[in-house]
């Protein structure tokens, strides 16, 4: 009986001991609550905008003066047998010779005595032969004295733009604000041509033809003519005879005339380049729906512009070829200003969308100058009132 009570007592003791050990064990692992999973999802804070920008061209103006003149190689006014070059021809020392036989039987050539004539000359236009039978040669120059300023709006240009906006949070209940920075590239292209006022100077040298009428222009002396001759044995051979028209080897007179007109000289101004815009500022966005929103932005803009300025001067004289001169200059400039834009944006997906908007930009102006010994031209490029449209795609990340 005692043994039974002992066994029963030990059973109760071990039962209580096991129960106490189970109570001291760690509680079972709880299943995580995923009801607030949205708090752990990454929300994109940045938006990249990539597209094109079509913007009005800068206002440009052109002005300046220049000189068109070939190097004067007409020689002295009265000297004989000189090398002379004109715009419409040339006169050189006489090249005629006589042939004599030396004591040893050899043929020797000697220059003919100076008889006031030359057989080496050329002319290019029939107008040089005067009605009273003389030959004239000319050198021309044009001093451009035009004071007009010609203004022109450069054509619109389309270029690429890239910008990134970083969401800074709520500004008001329905307004978000962000910081935006971007770059864009657009062209500069303007050209015009016009007649310009100029002072025209003509130097005319008159030469004696000794009653001869020269061949039709263009003509170059000495000249010869070939003919076919039949020999006594029936064969043929070619015979060459000199038919040069002789000219006086010194000018009879030199005359200089100067007139002013606005029809003989034509200028063409051309400006070609591009400008790179960097801009940064705050942006405010109004959310209409979950997909549709509008934003406005304004801030600083800096422009790096590079342009090539070319002026082509041309003068069509009465005789001879056109006289043309081209002068050019290249320059680069930095300019600081401001911008403003308004944009509508539609989100097609959570990450991508489309945008369209209007832009305004004012970044000052700069002058480009061509300065040479014979030209001084100025072009003004005004980048202070540019406006246009922008459109493209958005990417959130």
Task: Locate predicted features.
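Outer-membrane beta-barrel "beta-signal"
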Residues: 22-26, 383-397
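Cleavable N-terminal export/targeting peptides
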Residues: 1-43
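Transmembrane beta-strands of outer-membrane beta-barrel pores
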Residues: 52-58, 183-189, 276, 300-308, ...
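Short loop/turn motifs that connect adjacent beta-strands in outer-membrane beta-barrel proteins
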Residues: 33-46, 165-179, 190-192, 287-294, ...
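Residues on the lipid-exposed face of transmembrane beta-strands in outer-membrane beta-barrel proteins
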Residues: 160-168, 181-183, 278-286, 298-302, ...
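Outer-membrane beta-barrel domain signature, strongest for Gram-negative TonB-dependent receptors
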Residues: 33-64, 182
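Extracellular/periplasm-exposed beta-strand and loop segments of Gram-negative cell-envelope proteins
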Residues: 63-66, 127-156, 188-274, 304-335, ...
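Surface-exposed strand-loop-strand hairpins of Gram-negative outer-membrane beta-barrel proteins
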Residues: 56-157, 194, 333
């Amino acid at each position: 009986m005692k043994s039974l009570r002992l066994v029963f007592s030990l059973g109760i003791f071990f039962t209580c001991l096991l129960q106490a050990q189970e109570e001291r064990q760690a509680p079972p692992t709880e299943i995580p609550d995923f009801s607030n999973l949205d708090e752990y999802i990454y929300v994109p804070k940045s938006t990249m905008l990539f597209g094109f920008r079509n913007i009005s061209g800068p206002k440009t103006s052109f002005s300046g003066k220049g000189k068109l003149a070939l190097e004067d190689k007409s020689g002295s006014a009265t000297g004989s047998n000189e090398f002379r070059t004109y715009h419409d021809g040339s006169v050189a020392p006489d090249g005629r010779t006589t042939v004599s036989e030396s004591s040893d039987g050899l043929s020797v050539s000697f220059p003919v005595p100076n008889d006031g004539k030359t057989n080496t000359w050329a002319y290019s236009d029939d107008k040089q032969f005067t009605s009273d039978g003389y030959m004239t040669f000319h050198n021309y120059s044009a001093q451009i004295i035009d004071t007009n300023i010609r203004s022109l709006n450069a054509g619109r240009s389309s270029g690429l733009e890239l910008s990134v906006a970083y969401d800074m949070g709520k500004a008001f209940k329905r307004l978000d604000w962000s910081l935006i920075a971007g770059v864009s590239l657009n062209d500069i292209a303007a050209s015009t041509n016009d007649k310009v006022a100029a002072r025209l100077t003509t130097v005319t040298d008159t030469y004696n033809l000794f009653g001869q009428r020269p061949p039709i222009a263009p003509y170059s002396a000495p000249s010869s003519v070939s003919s076919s001759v039949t020999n006594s044995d029936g064969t043929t051979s070619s015979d060459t005879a000199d038919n040069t028209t002789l000219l006086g080897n010194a000018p009879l007179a030199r005359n200089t005339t100067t007139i002013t007109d606005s029809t003989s000289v034509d200028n063409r101004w051309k400006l070609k380049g591009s400008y790179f815009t960097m801009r940064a500022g705050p942006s405010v966005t109004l959310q209409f729906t979950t997909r549709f929103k509008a934003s406005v932005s304004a801030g600083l803009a800096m422009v790096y512009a590079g342009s090539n300025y070319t002026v082509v001067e041309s003068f069509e004289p009465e005789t001879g070829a056109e006289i043309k001169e081209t002068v050019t200059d290249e320059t680069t400039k930095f300019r600081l200003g401001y911008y403003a834009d308004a944009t509508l944006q539609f989100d097609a997906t959570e990450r991508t969308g489309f945008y369209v908007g209007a832009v305004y930009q004012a970044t000052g102006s700069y002058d480009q100058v061509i300065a040479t010994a014979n030209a001084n031209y100025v072009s003004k490029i005004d980048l202070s009132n540019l406006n246009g449209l922008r459109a493209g795609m958005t990417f959130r990340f």
